[in-house]
Amino acid sequence: MINVAVNGYGTIGKRVADAIIKQPDMKLVGVAKTSPNYEAFIAHRRGIRIYVPQQSIKKFEESGIPVAGTVEDLIKTSDIVVDTTPNGVGAQYKPIYLQLQRNAIFQGGEKAEVADISFSALCNYNEALGKKYIRVVSCNTTALLRTICTVNKVSKVEKVRATIVRRAADQKEVKKGPINSLVPDPATVPSHHAKDVNSVIRNLDIATMAVIAPTTLMHMHFINITLKDKVEKKDILSVLENTPRIVLISSKYDAEATAELVEVARDLKRDRNDIPEVMIFSDSIYVKDDEVMLMYAVHQESIVVPENIDAIRASMKLMSAEDSMRITNESLGILKGYLI
């Protein structure tokens, strides 16, 4: 049983913590939180041990939330830390992980240099085996890599061109925007997503463009892939349909808008209405000779959660990629095939 700490209990951290609890080979030893907000109160009510920075102890105790210790105490009780702190904060914690000789999993908001390897379970699990510091790439990059590495099973991917429509903020981020604008992110090519993909697939010819849209629900990707060989649509459909962590959305569902997909998640009784699978619109798949085009939705709050679980096992050399992904998928109810 691996003792896992989660440093940072926000959008990603609380989901990763819940996923750890569901794993047969992991124990959540506690979470680190900086402010006694509603997330901390709910974690306490659920019996999760809460650790805080030294300077925050009094604030938590005055709020009525018992403190199990400092963040350093939490790190010491663990075998490995999943760092889900805000962008850039993980790099500030790395010297502590080094000093205490603890493995750590970082998130895509950190620069690639913070870790020994950038990680996508479907693409490079084996390369990450035994790496002390692993960076799980961002939500958008995770979706790109899942799709690219899956299509690559049919024929070698030679070139990728993708346009990303990014959500402006997560649903709880009330101080972010835009509210009534489309914002290039940035107005240059490529966006940072291409470089992030290349941190995993080093020599891939990829260019990306991105725009921020006034929505909170999901991202959307529009992707054009050039393959080494001529392929048929049925082969692309087959590999997408048979790869876990990818689901197909058929037009017969009459649910193609991202808001409708959230409603589907509600009706399916998904935890927090999460859909960690890449949601590919099956009717968007276009294949001609060596060219593949498709569009898909990305639930930014949950897509990286299974990757974090697999990254833990890879870092600790617990099992093979196939076994880890199977256990993760089964424990979290992650699907393949059609969503409904």
UniProtKB/Swiss-Prot annotation:
Which superkingdom does the taxonomy of this entry point to? Archaea
| Disulfide bonds, paired cysteine numbers | C123-C149
Q: What is this protein called?
A: Glyceraldehyde-3-phosphate dehydrogenase
Per the UniProt record, the source organism is: Saccharolobus solfataricus (strain ATCC 35092 / DSM 1617 / JCM 11322 / P2) (Sulfolobus solfataricus)
Which family is this protein grouped under? Belongs to the glyceraldehyde-3-phosphate dehydrogenase family.
Q: What residues bind D-glyceraldehyde 3-phosphate, as annotated?
A: S138, C139, N140, H193, A194
InterPro entries reported in the protein's UniProt record: DapB_N, GlycerAld/Erythrose_P_DH, GlycerAld_3-P_DH_AS, GlycerAld_3-P_DH_cat, GlycerAld_3-P_DH_NAD(P)-bd, Glyceraldehyde-3-P_DH_2_arc, NAD(P)-bd_dom_sf
> Sorted alphabetically, which Gene3D superfamilies does this protein's record hold?
Dihydrodipicolinate Reductase, domain 2, NAD(P)-binding Rossmann-like Domain
Coiled-coil ranges (or none): none
Per the annotation, which location comes first and is thus the protein's main one? Answer: cytoplasm
